[in-house]
A protein has these predicted regions:
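Long, contiguous interaction/recruitment modules in multidomain scaffold/adaptor proteins
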Residues: 1-28, 38-40, 47-65, 72-74, ...
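Terminal, low-structured helical/coil segments at or just beyond the last alpha-helical repeat
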Residues: 2-18, 216-219, 223-257
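Structural signature of tandem alpha-helical TPR/SEL1-like repeats
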Residues: 8-11, 39-50, 72-85, 106-119, ...
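Position-specific recognition of the canonical hydrophobic site in helix A of tetratricopeptide repeat
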Residues: 30, 34-37, 64, 71, ...
Length: 257
């Protein structure tokens, strides 16, 4: 009984000696900045992050929050400058290089984005979003073959990553290869039959290929899933126009008969 009593006393003494470290002023300002940023008060959050960094020049969370706020304010040059500072502090964090690449893309500088996105992937091969953004960057600098290679590799190694199918198909449409685009969209809806944008992509591809009956069918399938979307008006209007085109295309054959 005495043994247990002594143990309790010793435990109580030890607990009295344990105290949680006080949060620094820099940390508190960063937390406040995060709260303002989550509330979409980006300009207000910038001030908190800057004050936090003034106290602690190596506060990574404050730098990242600051860069994110600048990005949402469309102030990409400042976001880029802040992220570059972050990569100097920690050059092993794939997230920092990824965001740096994204900001360069958003600032209309895809060539500058490429090396940072590559570095993000080198650090973390599982960063699928970085690979998608890298493909987009290559497409924007007229390196569509490299984009296609990236999309095909993503689809091969991560068949459930649906964004790779959609982006590949959209790129093929931009290149005028509507046949291959439609095939890729079909692969996508095989994976997810509710991916409504794929039906619109198929319809538009068939439309461009002058397969109007098929186009109408897939415009309707799109409308079944998204009858109140922004693109629904276009789909309905196009169905109406194609219904008028189809009889006109058949008319010459009727005259021959």
């Amino acid at each position: 009984m005495q043994i247990n009593s002594n143990m309790d006393k010793n435990l109580a003494k030890a607990m009295n000696k344990v105290s949680l470290p006080k949060r620094s002023r820099s940390y508190e300002l960063c937390v406040r900045g995060d709260a303002l940023r989550f509330a979409k008060l980006f300009q207000e959050s910038v001030r908190c992050y800057l004050d936090s960094i003034m106290i602690d020049r190596n506060h990574q969370e404050a730098y990242f929050g600051l860069a994110t706020s600048y990005k949402y304010l469309n102030n990409y040059p400042k976001a880029i400058k802040t992220l570059k500072k972050l990569t100097e502090i920690d050059d092993k964090n794939d997230k920092y290089f990824y965001e740096l690449g994204v900001c360069y893309l958003s600032d209309g500088k895809p060539a500058e984005a490429i090396p940072h996105l590559v570095q993000s992937i080198v650090i973390n091969r599982e960063n699928l979003e970085a690979q998608i953004q890298l493909a987009i960057a290559h497409e924007l600098v007229d390196e569509s073959e490299l984009s296609l290679m990236i999309y095909n590799k993503l689809i091969e190694t991560n068949p459930e990553f649906l964004k790779a199918y959609y982006n590949k198909a959209a790129m093929l449409m931009g290149l005028g290869d509507f046949e291959e685009a439609s095939k890729t969209f079909f692969q996508l809806i095989k994976r997810n039959p509710d991916y409504y944008k794929a039906y619109l992509g198929i319809a538009m591809s068939f439309d461009k290929l002058e397969k109007y009956s098929d186009a109408i069918r897939y415009y309707r399938k799109f409308l079944e899933l998204k009858s109140f979307s922004e693109d629904a008006l276009f789909a309905r209007q196009r169905i109406k126009e194609l219904k008028e085109i189809i009889p006109a295309k058949k008319e010459p054959y009727l005259k021959l008969i």
